[in-house]
UniProtKB/Swiss-Prot annotation:
This is S-adenosylmethionine synthase. InterPro entries: ADOMET_SYNTHASE_CS (IPR022631), S-AdoMet_synt_C (IPR022630), S-AdoMet_synt_central (IPR022629), S-AdoMet_synt_N (IPR022628), S-AdoMet_synthetase (IPR002133), S-AdoMet_synthetase_sfam (IPR022636). SUPFAM superfamilies: S-adenosylmethionine synthetase. NCBIfam families: metK (TIGR01034). Keywords: ATP-binding, Cytoplasm, Magnesium, Metal-binding, Nucleotide-binding, One-carbon metabolism, Potassium, Transferase. Its cofactor is Mg(2+); K(+). Pfam families: S-AdoMet_synt_C, S-AdoMet_synt_M, S-AdoMet_synt_N. It comes from Staphylococcus aureus (strain JH9). One of its GO terms (biological process) is S-adenosylmethionine biosynthetic process.
């Protein structure tokens, strides 16, 4: 008999993972700048390795930020507070290599191509995209957060892993960790059970593997994953190498923008390739990806599709997107052409329009840099609002 069930896997990492340290540092610097200079241009990259961090990039701003102080505060908050962890906020070296934004790029952002020969003082019209590129947003009704179940549970487990370390429940845990969840779908594409959960967590040298496995199940997995999704066939792999003492930047170098699938939809939807962290909202890699999620989520919440993927694309120095594409994977209640028409009418997808629509000049980015930019339950980001649902319903009758 043919088995029509399928498996899909996504992963997340904790805030102490080297790549996520880099993301959080880059976004902490961005926030510190935006707090005093909302119009700053920031492209901040971070590299972390044993005993040091390198901060590089292009920043144009009217304010001053003590970058080493921001870096140390961020590392401390994550939990690298002792030299024995292989990374310590007090003793680490911090190198900075910061230039200003290229004037060639700035002229295209400051004055969009469409309005370069006109006397438009309207910022929404005047601002061009900070780069070319394509961005995707996605939503599905398989969870209350409009996220695929595998990435949603991966983030929840990774956050729980960090929480039990920080609150002392499992005080032998260390900051680095990874989680992976495999979901089984039935023939109608509904999630029915968890097939496999993988948890790898850094730990103190003096704790046994058996204790770690028992504690992770009791304090991380069972309180987080709904009981009806786990059965006797569910497989658990907890620290399957047997030992994870050396971790964080001592174990692996980390770099901003290396966890773009963790940051988005866990591989369930397409990705344009651009990362988010360390970029101010004139960079459409970030702001347009947020806008695409905003559009997709409101379409699904309006009942116009069970799942929806939105692609936006831009040319550097040009305000209007060069293309808008929508794919509902056969679940749409109306044609994709009708949806595109409604989106053009009710969403301003020019860079400055996105910034205004989603209020993106706020210093809100550090909290996006771990446990996902989308579908969060611990904080409500502007691109997660469902305030366009009624407008979309009215615009598209079926």
């Amino acid at each position: 008999m043919l088995n029509n069930k399928r498996l899909f896997t996504s992963e997340s990492v904790t805030e102490g993972h080297p790549d996520k340290i880099a993301d959080q540092v880059s976004d902490a610097i961005l926030d510190a700048i935006l707090k005093d200079d909302p119009n700053a241009r920031v492209a901040c990259e971070t590299t972390v390795t044993t005993g040091m961090a390198l901060i590089a990039g292009e920043i144009s701003t009217t304010t001053y930020v003590d970058i080493p102080k921001v870096v140390r505060e961020t590392i401390k908050e994550i939990g690298y507070t002792r030299a024995k962890y292989g990374y310590d906020y007090e003793t680490m070296a911090i190198l900075t290599a910061i230039d200003e934004q290229s004037p060639d790029i700035a002229q295209g952002v400051d004055k969009a191509l469409e309005y370069r020969d006109k006397d438009s003082e309207e910022e929404i019209e005047a601002t061009g995209a900070g780069d070319q590129g394509l961005m995707f947003g996605y939503a599905t009704n398989e969870t209350e957060t409009y996220m695929p179940l595998a990435i949603y549970l991966s983030h929840q487990l990774a956050k729980r892993l960090s929480d039990v370390r920080k609150d002392g429940t499992l005080n032998y845990l260390r900051p680095d960790g990874k989680v992976q969840v495999t979901v089984e779908y039935d023939e109608n594409d509904n999630p029915v059970r968890i097939d496999t959960i993988v948890v790898s967590t850094q730990h103190a040298d003096d704790v046994t593997l058996e204790q770690i496995q028992e504690d992770i199940k009791a304090h991380v997995i069972y309180p987080t994953v709904p009981e009806n999704l786990i059965n006797e066939q569910t497989k658990f792999y907890i620290n399957p190498t047997g030992r994870f003492v050396i971790g964080g930047p001592q174990g692996d170098a980390g770099l901003t923008g290396r966890k773009i699938i963790v940051d988005t939809y866990g591989g369930y939807a397409r990705h344009g390739g651009g990362c988010f962290s360390g970029k101010d909202p004139t960079k459409v890699d970030r702001s347009a990806a947020y806008a695409a999620r905003y559009v997709a989520k409101n379409i699904v919440a309006a009942g116009l599709a069970d799942q929806c993927e939105v692609q936006l694309a831009y040319a550097i120095g040009v305000a209007e997107p060069v293309s808008i594409a929508i794919d509902t994977f056969g679940t749409g209640k109306v044609s994709e052409g009708q949806l595109v028409e409604a989106v053009r009418k009710h969403f301003d997808l020019r860079p400055a329009g996105i910034i205004k629509m989603l209020d993106l000049k706020q210093p809100i980015y550090k909290q996006t840099a771990a446990y996902g930019h989308f579908g969060r339950t611990d904080v409500l980001f502007p691109w997660e609002k469902l305030d366009k649902v009624e407008e979309l319903k009215d615009a598209v009758k079926y």
